[in-house]
């Protein structure tokens, strides 16, 4: 599992060298409004765009199971990637509920907060991360995990799940990659 979410800078290199064209043009003004530097996570990226990037990088999106194991950081039966104490969330996660006590209005640069027990950053908060899996048996929506800056601490729970259609892009959706086959 990559230690960091894919950044804007990394995604731009992919676009330039691969020639990949998303179905709809990327709204870079929107991207930079919420994620203002090349070191911030790439947002407004669909599951299709995330998958294309991963393939270009010789990687893939994590399965939901892989994502959850990695997010737990070695903990078992704990609510969050850092344990059970929600009051520590500000040290590990960028989310809506910091009471203005963090430095970021929206996304934080990747790796700005403490890593989990496996040395992985931003496994809780910052941006929801696309996973390989379908959400449910109807195969209409893809899984997103991890919570985001837009949601409260409840979204930071390791077991929290979200979903959306694979062509959807939002200002709080991003991704990270994993090496190897599933």
Enumerate the predicted regions with their spans.
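A short glycine-rich, aromatic-capped structural motif
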Residues: 1-28, 44-48, 125
